[in-house]
Amino acid sequence: MKSRSTVISLITIICGFYLYELLDSGIIGTFGLYGIELLKSTNEWYRLVTVALVHDNSNTLPIHLAFNMLALHSLGTPIEQFMGRTKFLVIFFVSLIGGSLLSAYSLGYNGYSIGASGAVFGLFGAFVVIGKRMNGEIKSVIIVIALNFALGFTI
């Protein structure tokens, strides 16, 4: 029996949290990310990872979640196949924590962040590096990265 893809498992977990979030929007406050000063004062460092589990549910369409999961699947699947489960997870979590720290430092004291975008942008970076090493065409990936970056400021 073929083992389940790590990417599919992550998507299932994140989407499961989103469904729970629809029933209890307080989960965003439990798992979302604060600005660095509040993060330090509360000592809730787990939020650097749990931020990926919660997404905006304030509108009727889960656009933020959909874009993150589409990117996770589109980028994560070939990266996991090429590099293996362990290296994929290292890239995912290092990117997630790095993106969360960058976000926390830029938020200020009362800022708040949600979503898996930090991990997704890390996967974009890994995809570009792999593509360059394999002499692949990465121009279209760069365009998608730019579009996702711009979209991040509109959602």
Locations of regions flagged by a protein language model:
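A detector for small-residue-rich transmembrane helices and their helix-helix packing motifs
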Residues: 1-155
